[in-house]
Amino acid sequence: MDEPTGTVLFTTVGRPYYGFDVFSLDLASRRERRLTDGLSINFNAQFASAGDDEDDDDQKVVFVSERTGCPRVYLARSGFSQPEPLPSAPGSLFHDRPILRNGLLYFISAHEAPDKSFAGWSALYSADLEGREIARLTPYGSVDYSPAVSQTGKFVAVASYGSRPWGGEFHALNTDIVVFRESDPTERVVVAEGGGWPTWSGDSVVYFHRKADDGWWSIFRVEFEFPQDTDFSRFPLAPTRVTPPGVHCFTPAAMPGSNKIAVATRRRGKSYRHIEIFDAGSESFVPITEPLNPNFHHYNPFVSPGSRYVGYHRFRGESTGGESRVPNIEPVASPIKGIQMLRLNGSFPSSSPDGQFVAFNHDFEAAVNGGVKIVRSDGSSRWTLIKDRTAFYNSWSPTEKNVIYTSIGPIFHSPKTTVQIARIKFDLSGPERDVACDVKVLTREDTGNNAFPACSPDGKWLVFRSGRTGHKNLFIVDAANGEFDGGIRQLTDGPWIDTMPSWSPNNDLIAFSSNRHNPGDASTFSIYLIRPDGSGLRRVLLAGPEGSPEVDRERINHVCFSRDGEWLLFTANLGGVTAEPVSWPNQFQPYGELYVARLDGSGLKRLTWNGFENGTPAWHSTHAVGLGDPWSATGEGWDEDKLRGQFEEPLWISCNI
């Protein structure tokens, strides 16, 4: 088979709860206005006016929306009920940071694969709105993020890795500020080392953010004249710090004709990201969003040509109209014709043998929304099992419709932490949504951390990860009786981490993640295959040949087999990061994207592109799942979460410095 087929279920950290819309704030009247329509999430906008003070309004914006299942660029105009799709890169499932200037649309896309692993896919493109011709402005082999166009449109700035590979960082990216003429994108100048999210003031001043040596994210400034010849010897320049320590400042937007910049801030004693205006002349801040919406996060400001309006995106709120529920399951665009992609409002999906239901974990805190959830595969009805217990990772018995195996206890803890494998038997035929269950624990309480159960295709055995020896290795037990009556057999043994196993539908192999090639590094994992009898262990090489620096940088988890046993599905760090993580809410591992590959490592194909962490994938037990329109009115009786904008700021941004 040249390409895999089937339905993939997965989760995206935080994404279902964003509810982003684009807003503008009139600085004269302090009136806030929503510019987008409340469908899907809408973000990373820019005003689409002509670029001079006489056109200083907020009537048109270009922005990114995921309303078609992937990020694409749209134009919203006052008085029009629907936004207009703008040109996109053919085959691209990721567009970001659009700018409309002088008849050209600039945007980031990630549709062209680099020629090596751990090189980002993001690059800058432009589209002529008249002829719709798409041009790549980033040199092949280079990676660019976060473009900005100067006031006249003559110059472009980007945050760029150049041709350097991604170094594995995902808090502050090691990008430089690069400038080039719009008329000649091949002649690029590094004007400042170390920085991101550039913004122009005129044609000769660029502001950008950077994490300073004292630990505070701050705004920096460089001023220069672009060389008329090819003598770039005076570059890069030493930038001037603009914002003071004591407050985090990110994602600046220069206000034309002044020394002011709009910035997103995080302050001591404050839980929310807000937009403020910083006056570099008086060195003072003016808060603009906190007085209006003190308990909402606000992201990525942008400014109108005459500086009257400041825009941003935030959770739309519960009173503005638009989508107000979180779909249990929603479709996502797929790059492979034979694969259906479905995002789940939860983690660790596992489908029933007949394909009618999906088991998952909604939350990993028992008091919040723990236990095991079950939802119909069409996204409608939902049930809760073991409601007040912490559970994670599920495996539906392939031979019993009403039996699920799960892990009960805290997730991602030490080998000695008590976590147990449980067999849950239940009946969904009654009217109750909180379903009474028969829970049978299959592992002894004194055996430490037992988790990630996977059932054999005949339903007789479970393979799982256990820390009972002091290391996390794989074991096999009887699926009905566990280790109490059925005994237990150790499958792998060593001072490393073997985890997240998956049993082949052909019953001949078990796939798992392991750092056994480098046991001293708990951040790198590769895929391994082993037979159920313990023979035939081999590593699946994806990033490079055995012993290469690239292959030992792999962080690959949550591997599982396709329905025919010919393909592996997993989440990996092979493509770096797609957008600047500091511009988003919290993502634990923003490099996490979904891939498929054959069992020998060939045929590697990427499935997702965005600035989020995508993970815990699983193949649905049926080829295709029928869903209704995710943006239509919620059907009566559907059990879905209310959209409340419940997400966190990046946990690695601390004000305790």
Protein language model features and the residues they cover:
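Sequence signature of WD/YWTD-type beta-propeller architectures
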Residues: 1-657
